[in-house]
Amino acid sequence: MAVEQDIFDAVVMADERFHGEGYQEGYEEGSSLGIVEGKRYGMVHGAKIGSEIGCYRGFALAWKCLLHSGAGEKDSRKMKVVEALIALLQDFPYDDPTYEKLHEDLDRIRGKFRQLCSLLNVQPDFKVTPGGSGLAF
């Protein structure tokens, strides 16, 4: 009688067993696909931020050279803002995506860039497109 009961238990419990196995297979497949999708998203987002930071750096270095050649008292305030932007860019953690204040520092850099553009009376239009990124005036 005990053998018959074990056979019936296997039949009755098959639904639960198949449900558990299906759940486990789905979980493993979803986890691996999630890792791939997360990696792809991180690469795209990191490339956009890198392009933006590179554009700010090039902009700041170009204006540093331009303002240095015609250093007058009027340009001293502009030069201080350029130097502050360059300092922020140099301190930015390019190789640490887990840095706690990454977004705060990025917002600070963007604010300093806007301040510099205002002082220079320049209207930047930074765009990241599939064909590349650019800063237009």
Curated annotation (Swiss-Prot):
GO terms for cellular component: nucleus. Keywords: Acetylation, Nucleus. GO terms for biological process: protein maturation; ribosomal large subunit biogenesis; translational initiation. InterPro entries: Essential_protein_Yae1_N (IPR019191), LTO1_adapter (IPR052436). The complex LTO1:YAE1 functions as a target specific adapter that probably recruits apo-ABCE1 to the cytosolic iron-sulfur protein assembly (CIA) complex machinery. May be required for biogenesis of the large ribosomal subunit and initiation of translation. May play a role in the regulation of proline metabolism and ROS production. Forms a complex with YAE1. Interacts with PYCR1 and PYCR2. This is Protein LTO1 homolog. It comes from Mus musculus (Mouse).
